[in-house]
Amino acid sequence: MATNYHDITIAFAGVCQAVSLVQQFAHKGSADREIFANSIKSLLVTQPDSTLAVFDGQLANLKLGLETVQAQMGSPNGKLDTEIGRYWINVLALSQKLNKNPEAKAKLAERLQQIERQLPLYENDIMADQMIANLAAIYSDVISPLGSKIHVLGLQDYLVRPDIQQKIRASLLAGIRAGILWQQVGGTRWQFLFSRRKILNQTQQFYKSI
C-alpha cells in the first residue's frame, strides 16, 4: 500500500501548528485568535469525511502549521529548531501512547462529548474562556498521566498566568488530536528520517496553493 503523504502532511501540519501556538503563548503571551480557533475547533471533528475536513476543509486553516513544517523539514542539514522540534516529537509520542490505551481513548472521547453538550451554554463558542479551561482540564486529566510532561519554555510572566496555562494545554490537546490523525493516515517516525524530502515537497505544494 502506497504511503499517503498528502494526508500525512496535513495531519503533521496540524501537530506543528498546535505546538507553534504553544510556543507563541509561552513567549509572547498571545497568538493569532483565528489560527488558535482553527486548531481548537478540530477537537470537535470526530467523524471527518477526509483528513482536511478536520480543519474545515481549508489548507489556509493550517497556514502556520505548513510554515512550521517547512522550517522543520527544510532546515539546513536537517537541523531542527530544538524547541519546536522537541514539542512535536513529544506530542507525537504522547498521541501514540494514547492510541495504545483504550481506556484513555474512551475517556477522551467522553470528555469531548461533554464539551459538545456544554457549547450551547456559551453561545456555541468553543473559544469562550470556560471552554478553553475545560479543554485544558481534559489535557491535564487524560493526556498528562500517559507519560512524561512536556516542559514548555517561555517567559515566566506568561507561564504563571492561569489563562496562558489553559491556552497552552488546550493547544497541546489539539496537537494530540492531530497526532492521532497522523497515525490513522499512516504517519510513522521513520518517515522523518527516510522521507523528509517527500513531506517537505508536499508541504510546499500545499503552501503555494493557499
Swiss-Prot record:
Its main location: cytoplasm. It comes from the Bacteria. It is a peripheral membrane protein. One of its GO terms (cellular component) is plasma membrane. InterPro entries: HflD, HflD-like_sf. It is found in: Cytoplasm; Cell inner membrane. This is High frequency lysogenization protein HflD homolog. The lineage of its organism: Bacteria, Pseudomonadati, Pseudomonadota, Gammaproteobacteria, Pasteurellales. The gene is hflD.
